[in-house]
């Protein structure tokens, strides 16, 4: 079993994503992510600027951000975003303890500003997801730039 497979299911379980949902999205994610790239965060999310666009699934690894969309009526999957983290700019996130949510925003290489809202249910999980995002986007980038 490769690194991605070993880390994807525990990350999805940690976020409370049902196995049926994970199974539907897994083939799309597998095509986008290298087998040696561990999953850091897997969660459902919505686009706050387009609330009727259906549900999204966000996968964050140490190298990529992949987002799939599932349509409301037919439950069809489509790849919404597949970006190398080095190609994202102006990445930010805003933890909201009052609503137990985290909003993530990033500008993709094509110049489009993407925003996703993760509802987490409990305030403790908000801080945990905040730490995961810090680890990937701040700590790892700092260590990579120091090594170069």
Predicted regions: what is each one?
Residues 53-74:
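Short, compositionally biased strand/turn segments
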């Amino acid at each position: 079993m490769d690194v991605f497979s070993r880390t994807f299911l525990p990350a999805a379980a940690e976020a409370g994503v049902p196995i049926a949902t994970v199974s539907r999205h897994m083939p799309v994610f597998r095509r986008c992510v290298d087998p040696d790239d561990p999953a850091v965060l897997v969660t459902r999310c919505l686009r706050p600027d387009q609330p009727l666009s259906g549900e999204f699934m966000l996968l964050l690894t140490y190298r990529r951000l992949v987002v799939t969309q599932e349509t409301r009526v037919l439950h069809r999957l489509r790849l919404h975003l597949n970006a190398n983290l080095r190609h994202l700019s102006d990445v930010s996130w805003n933890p909201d303890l009052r609503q137990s949510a985290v909003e993530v925003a990033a500008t993709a290489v094509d110049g489009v500003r993407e925003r996703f809202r993760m509802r987490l249910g409990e305030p403790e999980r908000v801080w945990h997801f905040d730490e995961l995002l810090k680890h990937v986007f701040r700590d790892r980038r700092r260590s990579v730039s120091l090594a170069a």
